[in-house]
């Protein structure tokens, strides 16, 4: 998971 969980799917 990235810290900006909005884009963490790509």
Curated annotation (Swiss-Prot):
Keywords, sorted A to Z: Hydrolase
Oligomer status and interactors: Monomer.
More about this protein: Has no activity towards sodium phytate, ATP, ADP, AMP, glucose-6-phosphate, fructose-6-phosphate and beta-glycerophosphate.
pH dependence: Optimum pH is 4.6. Activity decreases sharply with decreases and increases in pH and is absent at pH 8.0. When pre-incubated at different pH levels, activity is stable between pH 4 and 9.
Protein name in the entry: Acid phosphatase
Catalysis: reaction(s): a phosphate monoester + H2O = an alcohol + phosphate
Broadest EC class assigned to this enzyme: hydrolase
Regulation (activators, inhibitors): Activated slightly by Co(2+), Ca(2+) and Mg(2+). Strongly inhibited by NaF, Fe(3+) and Al(3+), less so by tartrate, Cu(2+) and Hg(+). Not affected by EDTA, Fe(2+) and Zn(2+).
GO molecular function terms noted in the UniProt entry: acid phosphatase activity
Annotated thermal dependence: Optimum temperature is 50 degrees Celsius. Activity decreases sharply with decreases and increases in temperature. When pre-incubated at different temperatures, activity is stable between 20 and 50 degrees Celsius.
GO biological process: dephosphorylation
Top-level taxonomic group: Eukaryota
Lineage of the species this protein comes from: Eukaryota, Fungi, Dikarya, Basidiomycota, Agaricomycotina
EC assignment: 3.1.3.2
């Amino acid at each position: 998971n990235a810290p900006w969980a909005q884009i963490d799917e790509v």
